[in-house]
UniProtKB/Swiss-Prot annotation:
GO biological-process terms attached to the record: defense response to bacterium
Tissue specificity as recorded in UniProt: Expressed by the skin glands.
Name listed for the protein in its UniProt record: Dermaseptin-H3
Signal sequence annotation: 1-22
Residues modified as Leucine amide: 66
Phylogenetic placement of the source organism: Eukaryota, Metazoa, Chordata, Craniata, Vertebrata
Cross-referenced InterPro entries: Dermaseptin_dom, Frog_antimicrobial_propeptide, FSAP
Subcellular location: Secreted
Principal cellular location given in the protein's record: secreted
A cellular component annotation (GO) from this entry: extracellular region
Organism encoding this protein: Pithecopus azureus
Region (Disordered): 24-44
Gene name of this polypeptide: dpp-H3
Keyword Secreted included in the entry's annotation: yes
Amino acid sequence: MAFLKKSLFLVLFLGMVSLSICEEEKRENEDEEKQEDDEQSEMKRGLWSTIKNVAAAAGKAALGALGEQ
């Protein structure tokens, strides 16, 4: 009976250790994905602001050209 208890505790302990390792790896992967998403959203924001600035400059130039005629 004592042998059965020891082996059961060993199995439970090893299962908990492997579970905690898997959870840690999962958290690391989620953190990496979040960083990549943040970087991509920053790039998109920068791209949109550049497009907006170019469109505003083109609009001003077009209005200036129409005003001169």
